[in-house]
C-alpha cells in the first residue's frame, strides 16, 4: 500500500518554447490569419523558457524515475556461531514520482524487477472503470488514475499488483468531495483529473498550482486554446512509445495533427497527460479565484510564474524574463534566496 474559476485566445507560435508547457497563448483574432512569422497573429506566443525549464523538468522526472527503485533486503543470522547469513526475499519498494506517465511508471516497474507487463496491466482493470468518472467510451488506458506514491510489494510482485495498489490509492484520494467539486466547476470528474494532470506538469512551486488551474478554467470558459506545450510532448511520447522527449519542439511539432495539441485545438486533451498527486488534484478541485489568462516563468529564476490578465502584461513579464536570460549569458537566471 502507499506510504505516502475560471476561462481562452487562438494560439501564436514563437520560435521559442515555454517552461513546462505553453504559458501564454495570445487572444484569438477576429478571423483566422496567417502566422506572419514568429510573432505574427494566429498562433500561440511562447517563450524560450521551454528549452531551459520544461526540458530540464522532463529530464529530471526521467532521472528520478530511473533512480526511484530501492530494493530492501532483510538479513538475519542463522542459528549457531556461524558467520553465514541468509537473505530473506527482497521486497521491492517502488517509488512513483508525482507527474509520472504510465510509460515512465512501466520503466520503474521493470527496474524494480516486477514480473509481467505494466503497460498491459495499466490498460484496464476490474477495480476501476474510467467511465465511472465520466471518461468517454474508448478511453485507451488508466492514465491519470495510477496514483503516484511509494509502494512496498510482497514477492513475487507482478506488475499488475502495482496497478491494483495504485488504483486503490487513487480511490482513497479522489472521492465524493472531488466529484462534488467537479460538478460545481461544470466539468466531469475525469476532466477535473485531466486538468490536475496538466497542473502537475506545469507547476514548479506549490504556490502556483491553484493559479495555473484557474488559468486553465478561465481559458476553457472563454473558448481559448490552452496552448500548453506539455500536452504536445505527451503526444510525441505516446506516438514514439518513449518515456521522455526532451528536445525543443520544432514548428512541425507545434502544429502536429493530434487531439493533444492544445495550441491548435480548443478544449481539454482527450486524456490526462500524467498521473497527478494530491496537491494538483486539490488545485484542480479548488482553483484560485483570480482573473488571470496568462503566465510566464518569472524573471527571478526561482521557479515561480508571473501571472497576468492581459496580453500586454504578459509581454512585459516575458520581456523581463528574456532580459534576465540575456544578462545571465543566455542561461536561465539564477535564483537568489528571497
Residue ranges and their predicted role:
Residues 107-127, 138:
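A short alpha->loop->secondary-structure connector
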Amino acid at each position: 500500500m502507499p506510504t505516502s474559476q475560471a476561462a481562452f485566445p487562438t494560439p501564436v507560435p514563437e520560435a521559442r518554447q515555454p517552461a513546462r508547457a505553453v504559458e501564454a497563448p495570445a487572444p484569438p483574432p477576429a478571423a483566422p490569419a496567417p502566422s506572419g512569422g514568429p510573432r505574427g497573429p494566429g498562433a500561440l506566443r511562447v517563450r524560450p523558457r521551454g528549452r531551459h525549464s520544461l526540458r530540464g523538468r522532463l529530464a529530471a522526472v526521467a532521472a528520478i524515475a530511473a533512480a526511484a527503485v530501492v530494493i530492501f533486503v532483510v538479513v538475519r543470522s542463522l542459528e549457531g556461531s556461524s558467520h553465514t547469513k541468509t537473505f530473506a526475499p527482497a521486497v521491492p519498494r517502488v517509488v512513483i514520482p508525482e507527474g509520472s506517465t504510465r510509460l515512465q511508471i512501466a520503466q520503474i516497474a521493470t527496474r524494480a524487477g516486477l514480473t509481467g507487463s505494466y503497460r498491459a496491466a495499466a490498460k484496464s482493470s476490474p477495480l476501476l472503470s474510467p467511465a465511472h468518472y465520466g471518461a468517454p467510451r474508448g478511453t485507451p488506458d488508466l492514465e491519470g488514475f495510477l496514483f503516484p506514491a511509494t509502494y512496498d510489494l510482497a514477492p513475487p510482485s507482478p506488475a499488475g499488483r502495482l496497478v491494483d495498489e495504485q488504483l486503490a490509492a487513487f480511490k482513497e484520494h479522489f472521492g465524493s468531495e472531488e466529484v462534488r467539486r467537479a460538478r460545481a466547476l461544470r466539468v466531469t470528474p475525469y476532466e477535473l483529473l485531466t486538468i490536475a494532470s496538466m497542473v502537475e506538469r506545469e507547476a514548479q512551486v506549490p504556490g502556483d498550482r491553484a493559479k495555473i488551474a484557474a488559468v486553465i478554467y478561465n481559458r476553457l470558459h472563454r473558448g481559448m486554446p490552452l496552448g500548453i506545450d506539455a500536452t504536445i510532448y505527451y503526444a510525441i511520447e505516446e506516438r514514439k512509445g518513449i518515456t521522455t522527449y526532451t528536445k525543443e519542439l520544432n514548428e512541425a511539432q507545434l502544429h502536429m495533427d493530434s487531439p493533444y495539441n492544445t495550441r491548435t485545438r480548443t478544449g481539454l486533451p482527450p486524456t490526462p497527460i500524467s498521473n497527478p498527486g494530491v496537491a494538483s488534484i486539490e488545485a484542480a478541485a479548488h482553483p484560485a479565484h483570480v482573473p488571470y489568462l496568462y503566465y510566464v516563468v518569472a524573471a527571478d529564476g526561482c521557479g515561480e510564474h508571473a501571472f497576468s490578465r492581459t496580453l500586454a502584461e504578459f509581454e512585459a513579464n516575458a520581456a523581463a524574463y528574456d532580459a534576465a536570460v540575456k544578462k545571465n549569458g543566455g542561461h536561465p537566471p539564477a535564483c537568489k534566496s528571497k
